[in-house]
């Protein structure tokens, strides 16, 4: 029945669990062997969708057909379920964030080494089209030397009305969206070390956990990266704003509206000043049209199903994993530094963590 397929057992059939089943329907090398959720109504829902359902976590972990346990539960549950699954002989995919601290992650890594099981994390935003466009621009030096990147996601509805509002479950925007945006930046600049971290958190709609944050990362070589998440923003700033010595790129929204503006090399011998309310300025005057060139953003398309295809290749063929545990640990330690900076209102010298 399962010949040549990698069989997943899914724990957690909430929003992300259902989303995983939709994605996996397009990955023929993987089959969902069954689903377990602690809530009976979720198990009933999964059964009505045609999935096999387990009556307990133990029943799933004792099923010899299951190769991989995919954990899509609240954040605080990831670590204990993953450890039990690996001890039961299962490979593990955890939803992000993998857990709530770097020490917890180290425990999970130790169990993976002890049991010889594959452990990875679903960092799916590496396949976002907007990120892939920015990565292409940076790698191809389309803007020359990039000296500043701004990465933002803004919403206006606060934190979703579930466990993400609660500290005990690992709620808050640093752990929810920050883990994505920080992973993208560290993946983009994988070989460059962070020198300093400064951050602030917001508590506009929630006093228990952060409902937004801003952090500024300074990388070796001087590149500065601003990462920001807001949930009480009724006018959103651009998703990406990238400044290079030879030009600027902007991606305004999820629909990939944006453009690139680069200098042509033509020198303005005489700058016409622009009139402002309180006087003239040449410094802030717009450039002459013949000194710049406007270009469309390149087309780059990602496929999130590639994450699961890679997992199947790792399990079946010993392929290199796309999401590596040292990368996950680096993101986790960076989030801890963000919390530390926000709590102390201090710039963190991050070089001690980048050895």
Where are these regions (language model features)?
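C-terminal helix-rich "cap/oligomerization" subdomain common to oxidoreductases
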Residues: 1-3, 68-70, 296-298, 306, ...
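N-terminal Rossmann-like dinucleotide-binding module
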Residues: 1-49, 355
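Beta-loop-alpha module in the N-terminal Rossmann-like domain of NAD(P)-dependent dehydrogenases
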Residues: 20, 38, 52-111, 304
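Rossmann-fold dehydrogenase core element
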Residues: 107-124, 144-151
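C-terminal glycine/acidic-rich active-site capping loop/insertion
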Residues: 124, 246-323, 354-355
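Predominantly a Rossmann-like dinucleotide-binding segment in NAD(P)-dependent oxidoreductases
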Residues: 125-206, 345
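Glycine-rich phosphate/pyrophosphate-binding beta-alpha loops
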Residues: 228-236
């Amino acid at each position: 029945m399962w010949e040549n397929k990698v069989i997943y057992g899914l724990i957690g059939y909430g929003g992300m669990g259902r989303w995983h089943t939709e994605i996996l329907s397009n990955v023929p090398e993987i089959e969902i062997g069954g689903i377990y959720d602690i809530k009976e109504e979720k198990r009933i829902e999964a059964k009505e969708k045609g999935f096999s359902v387990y009556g307990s976590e133990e029943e799933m972990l004792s099923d010899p057909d299951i190769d991989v346990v995919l954990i899509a539960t609240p954040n605080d549950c990831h670590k204990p379920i993953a450890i039990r699954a690996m001890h039961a002989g299962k490979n593990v995919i955890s939803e992000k964030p993998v857990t709530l601290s770097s020490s917890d992650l180290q425990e999970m890594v130790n169990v993976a080494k002890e049991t010889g099981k594959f452990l990875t994390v679903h960092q799916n935003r590496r396949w976002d089209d907007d990120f892939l466009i920015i990565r292409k621009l940076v790698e191809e030096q389309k803007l020359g030397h990039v000296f500043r990147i701004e990465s933002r996601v803004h919403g206006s509805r606060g934190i979703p009305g579930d466990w993400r509002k609660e500290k005990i479950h690992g709620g808050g925007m640093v752990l929810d969206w920050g883990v994505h945006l920080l992973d993208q930046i560290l993946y983009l600049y994988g070989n460059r070390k962070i020198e300093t971290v400064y951050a602030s958190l917001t508590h506009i709609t929630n006093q228990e956990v952060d409902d937004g944050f801003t952090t500024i990362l300074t990388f070796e070589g001087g590149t500065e990266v601003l990462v920001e998440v807001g949930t009480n923003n009724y006018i959103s700033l651009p998703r990406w704003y990238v400044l290079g010595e030879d030009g600027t790129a902007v991606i305004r929204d999820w629909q990939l509206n944006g453009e690139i503006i680069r200098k042509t090399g033509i020198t303005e011998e005489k700058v016409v000043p622009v009139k402002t309310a309180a006087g003239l300025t040449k410094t802030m005057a717009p450039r002459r049209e013949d000194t710049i060139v406007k270009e469309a953003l390149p087309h780059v398309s990602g496929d999130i199903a590639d994450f699961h295809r890679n997992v199947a290749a790792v399990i079946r063929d010993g392929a290199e994993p796309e999401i590596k545990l040292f990368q996950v640990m680096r993101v986790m330690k960076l989030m801890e530094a963000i919390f530390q900076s926000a709590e102390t209102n201090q710039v963190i010298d991050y070089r001690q963590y980048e050895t």
